[in-house]
Each structure stands twice: as structure tokens, then as C-alpha cells.
Amino acid sequence: MSETRTRAHVFVSGTVQGVFYRASTRDAARERGVRGWVRNLDDGRVEAVFEGPESAVDSLIEWCHTGSPDASVSDVSVSYTEPEGIDGFHIRR
């Protein structure tokens, strides 16, 4: 029996832009086999969508609380929905 798949919509606040947070998120997602995307928002936050096995998505969300080496994360907000079948993991502009 395969693990249940999930989709997480994530917003990360703090010093998360200009510190390679998006690229590090992409790399962390690929290491875990998580699909989705990540982008900077005009208000200084980072937004991401993660899809994959629950344990892999949960691991990536936990990673988001620390993020890239130069990041300083103050908050991670997550909501869950049904997966939509995203392919790959991309940085959106």
C-alpha cells in the first residue's frame, strides 16, 4: 500500500528573500521527491505549494522553519488540500 499523497500551500515570513531561500527550497524538495513550486511575494514572504507523500511534504515543511543558511524564518503558515498532480518542482518569478 502506498503512502497517502497531500498538497500543502505554504507561506513563509521573515528574512526569506535575497538569501537563496527559493533555490534552497527547490533543492530540498527534489531531495525528498516533492513536486510543486516556490515564489517570492511583493510583501516579502515566500509562497510555495508542495505535493507528494505526506511524510515527504511534512519533512519539507519542517525544513521551511529553518530554510537556507542565511534565512531568518519568523513564521510558516500551512493549509492542506487535495493534490492536483503537479510535475517537477519549479521556481516561479
UniProtKB/Swiss-Prot annotation:
Q: Does the keyword Hydrolase apply?
A: yes
- Show the active-site residues: 22, 40
| Annotated catalysed reactions | an acyl phosphate + H2O = a carboxylate + phosphate + H(+)
- SUPFAM superfamilies, from UniProt? Acylphosphatase/BLUF domain-like (SSF54975)
Entries under InterPro entries matching the protein: Acylphosphatase, Acylphosphatase-like_dom, Acylphosphatase-like_dom_sf, Acylphosphatase_CS
User: If you read the UniProt record, what top EC class would you report for this enzyme, in one word?
Assistant: hydrolase
Top-level division of the source organism's lineage:
Archaea
Q: Which UniProt keywords apply?
A: Hydrolase
Write the Enzyme Commission number(s) for this entry. Answer: 3.6.1.7
What molecular function does GO assign, one term? Answer: acylphosphatase activity
Which Pfam families does the entry mention?
Acylphosphatase (PF00708)
Q: Where is the Acylphosphatase-like domain?
A: 7-93
Identify its protein family.
Belongs to the acylphosphatase family.
Q: What is this protein called?
A: Acylphosphatase
Annotated organism of origin: Haloquadratum walsbyi (strain DSM 16790 / HBSQ001)
